[in-house]
Amino acid sequence: MSPNKRFKSARTLIGRPGAMVAAAALIAGCGGAAAAATGGLKSSSVHYATTPTSPGPINANAIPLGDGYLSTTPRVGYVDSCVTTFGGIGGARTDGPWINTKTKTWSDTTKIHVSGMVSWPDATYSVKVEGSKRVIEFDDLPVDHTSGTFPIQSTDPAYKYDQNGNHLAKQTFDWSLPLNPKPARKPSCTPGGPIGVLDDGVALFNALDGEGRDAGAHEVLDACGGHPNPADIYHHHDIPPCILRQVRDGTTKLVGYALDGYGIYVVKSANGTLPTNTDLDSCHGTTSVVEWNGKRQRIYHYVATLEYPYTVGCFHGTPIGAGGGSGPSGSGPGGGPPGGGPPAA
């Protein structure tokens, strides 16, 4: 797919009073269980899944495929999506050999990556507290790792499966999130664009690609689990390996923030395994004691898994922009945040 140059310098201001929310153009589809030291994951509010999940720690060679696990209501192991119609614009055109359609699993250990090691020395990412708000400003370029070479070159082995023709381009994201988020009256759906940001300074999207499939399985990403969409927004669909490696076994670490202000955490058991869907609620979160705002406290938070939907299945709190905006997009369908456009892998 050819890159959409009109949006290379687009400015996205979400959550600032009076700011234009220009999300519709920006989030077009892509071209592409053990308790930890913090006290564990179980809580009285947790709902238990039957599918899709595994009864124990997920085998990276046989991760349950998330295709079809899309809902318009919160469900454990699903993405509650604001988008219900998909345009078939995912970059991945051919299933790679890492996907086993018979067992409905995929292997993260044998999946190929986009080649290249492109540095971004001018990348910026800042988080600061202003009163009752957490202000996050970032340009969406990775601050602590390289990216692959995009567009994917025809000489790259990845090109056989994914012809992502988009570029990485500097963006301007300026978010004002609640410092102490509160549960919403009811959970809300996730849009097709940013649902949060990770601490490498890169936007986080939900688990769906432009065709409504499991993006982690189908889309060919770079070595740090990223790729750009047609608006040239570089993004992740899960917690990438370069961040997972930074979390020691038996510890819990805050690795990002969702649009509703809640934290996104990696929780590793003593032997290095991550929780599964059965440990988490319908929004892919739980309530337990973690480090938050400089102190240990019992709060709700999202938790990363190796299995779909990976990070945020729905919003537990009220995402910024949920009330609509003055820009061309307004709010997403179903009362979700702005930009209910087709997902990007």
Describe each PLM feature range.
Residues M1-L13:
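N-terminal secretory signal peptides that target proteins for export/translocation
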Residues I14-A25:
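Sec-dependent signal peptide hydrophobic core
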Residues A33-A35:
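Cleavable N-terminal signal peptides
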Residues A37-R213:
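Solvent-exposed N-terminal domain segments of exported/luminal and surface proteins
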Residues Q171-L177, L198-V202, N229-I243, K295-P309:
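Extracellular/lumenal glycan-associated surfaces
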Residues G212-D222, P230-T276:
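Short helix-loop boundary/capping segments
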Residues G324-A345:
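Disordered, low-complexity segments in secreted/periplasmic proteins that are enriched in proline
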